[in-house]
Amino acid sequence: MSQQQDKQPSENKLWGGRFTGATDPLMDLYNASLPYDKVMYDADLTGTKVYTQGLNKLGLITTEELNLIHQGLEQIRQEWHDNKFIIKAGDEDIHTANERRLGEIIGKNISGKVHTGRSRNDQVATDMRIFVRESLLNLSKILHQFITAILERAHKEIDVLMPGYTHLQKAQPIRWAHWLSSYATYFTEDYKRLQEIITRVNQSPLGSGALAGHPYGIDREFLAKGLGFDGVIGNSLTAVSDRDFVVESLFWSTLFMNHISRFSEDLIIYSSGEFGFIKLADAYSTGSSLMPQKKNPDSLELLRGKSGRVFGQLSGFLMSIKSIPSTYNKDMQEDKEPLFDALTTVEHSILIATGVISTLSIDKQNMEKALTMDMLATDLADYLVRKGVPFRETHHISGECVRKAEEEKLSGIDQLSFEQFQQIDSRFEKDVMETFDFEASVERRDALGGTAKSAVLKQLENLKSILS
């Protein structure tokens, strides 16, 4: 037997009694999660505080012991908060570290009762749900602020017209506020989904033990209420092994980042010299180390780039859990790094996006100068529809007008003479020239969801009512 195998396992290991040989130091490092799960210190201490209240109700901890435990837990909380908590060898995870420190403060004869009937399986599941719930509530708050900033901008700049694009080609005139409302709609749907996920996250696994349930009949509903959960997970096997809430949180983060990526891509294009529709504030731009004239939209490019990072966290975690058997397996430890990274990335992304949209300036003149008369070709077709001509026929006629203007090298279809319109189709009348007005074009799109001023204002009010 090697010298390493002769060593006794660390006294700090919660599971050390079964083993006679020490673990490989690399295995200790490979197995440890404290470097990243220490962010859950507050959730872990809160969970233990309420759990010991449940043990006190059962008579397994005296009230005097409970008070000492709670005092010790609050001291540990303060140490973590002040960055004074000392991590020691054998602190495998946040649960081990906190329990070890509690023993140092109040003595192991009392701290040793804290884990009665509890497993790290239900403990970590509880910590995760508390941490994720609080993280998602924070995301909900700042996402609300982001959407509100978009809506306020849309109200303020409701009268600004710009080209709308399909295939990145000029399509039809729209209101700048309509574009803003479009993304506000995406983000409001994200906001609504987030509320649904928070409801599903907020279920308590505490009191499920390792897998089979609690041996002392602890009041799980009491524990759930004390921790702010809406209810309990009704099956102990599921309670310790369910990570659907992690997957949902990652999927939500992925979908949101997809939306923020598209939002950023549009703004990157609009900020380019070729478009010149918007200008980012200096606070959200950077320069070039070589070219003094450059003002780069790095904030938006990072928002776009970090979406791929979050997508990867989701796909990676799904691969980690796709084939694991029921109840708890160590694979589940791989839930934390991708989730914590994704939640932090999304939080920072929302804050950056809020700053960008709140501080950018628009160039109304450039937006309106980019409008071209060929964008009113559909309006020309609609003109004939109102004269009773079938749309498929009017579409063809309007296309002929566009082709004629190109052949004549005219700047737009509005430059065709009335006689030329009549040569193409005799049903054109002199009022056809009234078609070529961008403001009139957008105002004709007044159906629900359209780009007319009344329609956009209704969209903004609807979104505002959802948020309120």
Swiss-Prot record:
One cellular component (GO) term of this entry = cytosol
| Gene3D superfamilies, sorted | Fumarase/aspartase (C-terminal domain), Fumarase/aspartase (Central domain), Fumarase/aspartase (N-terminal domain)
**EC no.?**
4.3.2.1
What gene, per UniProt, encodes this protein?
A: ARG4
Q: What class of enzyme is it?
A: lyase
Q: Which PROSITE patterns match?
A: FUMARATE_LYASES
Subunit architecture: Homotetramer.
Domain of life, per lineage: Eukaryota
Query: Which residues make up the binding site for 2-(N(omega)-L-arginino)succinate?
Result: S33, N121, T166, N296, Y328, Q333, K336
Give the catalysed reaction(s), semicolon-separated: 2-(N(omega)-L-arginino)succinate = fumarate + L-arginine
Please name the catalytic residues of this protein: H167, S288
- Its recorded name reads Argininosuccinate lyase
What GO annotations for molecular function exist for this entry? argininosuccinate lyase activity
Per the record, the GO terms for biological process are: arginine biosynthetic process via ornithine; L-arginine biosynthetic process
| Family under the similarity heading | Belongs to the lyase 1 family. Argininosuccinate lyase subfamily.
Query: Which keywords annotate this record?
Result: Amino-acid biosynthesis, Arginine biosynthesis, Lyase
Which PANTHER family does its entry note? Answer: ARGININOSUCCINATE LYASE
Pathway as given in its UniProt record: Amino-acid biosynthesis; L-arginine biosynthesis; L-arginine from L-ornithine and carbamoyl phosphate: step 3/3
Q: Where is this site: Increases basicity of active site His?
A: E301
